[in-house]
Amino acid sequence: MRTYRYFLLLFWVGQPYPTFSTPLSKRTSGFPAKKRTLELSGNSKNELSRSKRSWMWNQFFLLEEYTGSDYQYVGKLHSDQDRGDGSLKYILSGDGAGDLFIINENTGDIQATKRLDREEKPVYILRAQAINRKTGRPVEPESEFIIKIHDINDNEPIFTKEVYTATVPEMSDVGTFVVQVTATDADDPTYGNSAKVVYSILQGQPYFSVESETGIIKTALLNMDRENREQYQVVIQAKDMGGQMGGLSGTTTVNITLTDVNDNPPRFPQSTYQFKTPESSPPGTPIGRIKASDADVGENAEIEYSITEGEGLDMFDVITDQETQEGIITVKKLLDFEKKKVYTLKVEASNPHVEPRFLYLGPFKDSATVRIMVEDVDEPPVFSKLAYILQIREDAQINTTIGSVTAQDPDAARNPVKYSVDRHTDMDRIFNIDSGNGSIFTSKLLDRETLLWHNITVIATEINNPKQSSRVPLYIKVLDVNDNPPEFAEFYETFVCEKAKADQLIQTLRAIDKDDPYSGHQFSFSLAPEAASGSNFTIQDNKDNTAGIFTRKNGYNRHEMSTYLLPVVISDNDYPVQSSTGTVTVRVCACDHQGNMQSCHAEALVHPTGLSTGALIAILLCIVTLLVTVVLFAALRRQRKKEPLIISKEDIRDNIVSYNDEGGGEEDTQAFDIGTLRNPEAIEDSKLRRDIVPEALFLPRRTPAARDNTDVRDFINQRLKENDTDPTAPPYDSLATYAYEGAGSVADSLSSLESVTTDGDQDYDYLSDWGPRFKKLADMYGGVDSDKDS
């Protein structure tokens, strides 16, 4: 290939270079108005006329990928102002000037210093100018020219993908489109055949072919079967130079997969299947599974199962398991071994998705025979009915037979059966059953008005196998008997005005009856015989199970008779006739002109409920006595004397003890002001304490005396409680108020002891100067240092 490139280069250089002339762009600003032209001569595909110009150019085409050891000559720059004395300097600027292209500033020769690649940059635009060396001014306007890079076939075709993936349905016709591959060539498509790509297949025949110009891959073999071979690898070559010898080429791989079509019917691996199931299997119980195989995949391998014919067409069913594609045989109806022991079915497997163009391959279904054998099971007794409904009159006597139930063993053995009542459904044991024949009879009296329906359960059990039992519901309806008399629907109490007129309606009566006669209720109303004669009221039956009470005379006097009690007889028309007597209370009241009641007799409206006058007086006296007792107790409690705090004949202020062995001064014997202890209000402001070390003499603060009625004991108890609950209380030092000893005291304050410091830090020699009272204390603390020294 390198030899070929050299050949092209030599061929190009050896060609005669025709000359042409063309005007180039000129920049005239800054120059005298003198018309100048440039003359360029060099390589060109067309021969042009030559004319004299200010510039002469020998070459403007370069071959790419030049591999010579010397710089590649581009052309020569010359100005007609150049006299050959070196007074002019040639300058080159533009694309690649000084790097890719250099110019001899004396001769104007231009050379390429590096190997150029047309695919990187096909055209370079440069500018040339001649400058006077002495003045540094241009002698010609700057002119622009172009260097074009000629293409050579140095790039092979490259596919857009290294590996292609494609699919095509199996059994496709010849020429079915599969995929299109594309390769690109970086060479110049406008120059020669360097970029003209031709496709060919290197691997994959005779199954596939490729169009040389488009790169479209098509099927080349008829009826390719996925079940025989699914994957194909095809290698495609793209070659430039129109596929001629010496062209560059590239390859790509195309992985082609045949997709499935439904071209295979399902097939049972065997023609006959046999299963067993007990006769006690409930509907929906699976018996067995059958499976047909299909060489296809996906939805083309889906199978539907159905029972097409056979003795058990109505007794069994088949459903399809969508995950395993199996047919599940299930029980459709209850089986009976005693009736039929063996069933034969024909099960068919078919594809739900069939392509019509493959029907010529045959029917896409298969069938198999399934034999089902029913196994005998010891079954519980079976009642002749699913439920029983019986009736009985509510006046039936005990042990009256209502009806019977029947059950028998369905097995061939015909085991005997006994009957019983489930007592959970008959807690009151109202009914009983004959265990031998199933007769139902009463064991207690019935009442329809208490319970109309009795729902009980009867159990039938095999005598030889008590585990085998069955149940049946029994509904017993109690028939009505006219055994309840009618009665008022409510308690009737009404009134009549004193000025009422005769035949005036004062009350409408209604009745109810607990019985439920077949023809409905029909009540009749009348006054009791003892009240029918001489009554001040009459009753009128409305023939609609209601009646009205009317006045018989004009005017009533409530002072003579305030209340009338009317006995009313209510009867039904059923058999036997039942009747009852109800009382209607009629009160005589004063009414206004519109007939509205205003007032009745006190006994008629208000019952004397409450306490008598004597009882009220007694209760009032008890309350007064209790109040007096409470008042006296409170007064005595307030006047009770308080115990003294200190029982002493001495003055409470004499709390400074006088010693006879040492005369005290006036300040020692003078009683101090006790107001400090008896003024809690003054001390209340200084409850918060701060622990400090006293640094100066404590000056006692005089507090005015407290009020005489201040209880000192209560104050001391209060202070004691506060100190007990105060977390800042001693043993550590704090400012406190002590009894004032006078200004002449040797120990200014107890705080001067500074008990917070350690014994080693104290000098107790001054205790011996305090006098005989502190002699013992001075001996105790004064010997500490001597003990340590010893």
Swiss-Prot record:
UniProt GO cellular component terms: adherens junction; catenin complex; glutamatergic synapse; nucleoplasm
PANTHER family per record: CADHERIN-23, CADHERIN-6
Domain Cadherin: 54-159, 160-268, 269-383, 384-486, 487-608
InterPro entries on file: Cadherin, Cadherin-like_dom, Cadherin-like_sf, Cadherin_CS, Cadherin_Y-type_LIR, Catenin-bd_sf
Location(s), subcellular: Cell membrane
Domain of life assignment: Eukaryota
Topology with respect to the bilayer: Single-pass type I membrane protein
Principal location: membrane
Region (Disordered) location: 261-291
Signal peptide coordinates: 1-18
Keywords: Calcium, Cell adhesion, Cell membrane, Cleavage on pair of basic residues, Glycoprotein, Membrane, Metal-binding, Phosphoprotein, Repeat, Signal, Transmembrane, Transmembrane helix
Biological process annotations from GO: adherens junction organization; calcium-dependent cell-cell adhesion via plasma membrane cell adhesion molecules; cell migration; cell morphogenesis; cell-cell adhesion mediated by cadherin; cell-cell junction assembly; homophilic cell adhesion via plasma membrane adhesion molecules; Notch signaling pathway
Polar residues biased stretches: 269-279
Protein name: Cadherin-6
Taxonomic lineage: Eukaryota, Metazoa, Chordata, Craniata, Vertebrata
Residue numbers of Phosphoserine PTMs: S786, S790
UniProt cross-references to Gene3D superfamilies, sorted A to Z: Cadherins (2.60.40.60), TCF3-CBD (Catenin binding domain) (4.10.900.10)
Residues carrying a glycan: N255, N399, N437, N455, N536
Key word Nucleus present: no
